[in-house]
Amino acid sequence: MAGEIFTTAGLCIVLTLVGVALGYGILRVTQGGAE
């Protein structure tokens, strides 16, 4: 049970970090292209 919980939490953290990184990258590209 504990292993599954840690795995699920790890996946959630990774997905969140990936989402933030993608969003940040898109914003930088959009702002850089606009300027």
From Swiss-Prot:
Cell location: Cellular thylakoid membrane
TM ranges: 9-27
One annotated Gene Ontology cellular component of this protein: plasma membrane-derived thylakoid membrane
One of the GO biological process terms: photosynthesis
Pfam families linked to this entry: PetM
GO molecular function, one term: electron transfer activity
InterPro entries (UniProt xref): PetM_cyt_b6/f_cplx_su7 (IPR012595)
Broad class of the protein's primary localization: membrane
Family: Belongs to the PetM family.
Oligomer status and interactors: The 4 large subunits of the cytochrome b6-f complex are cytochrome b6, subunit IV (17 kDa polypeptide, PetD), cytochrome f and the Rieske protein, while the 4 small subunits are PetG, PetL, PetM and PetN. The complex functions as a dimer.
Protein name, as recorded: Cytochrome b6-f complex subunit 7
Organism encoding this protein: Synechococcus sp. (strain JA-2-3B'a(2-13)) (Cyanobacteria bacterium Yellowstone B-Prime)
Lineage of producing organism: Bacteria, Bacillati, Cyanobacteriota, Cyanophyceae, Synechococcales
Encoding gene, per UniProt annotation: petM
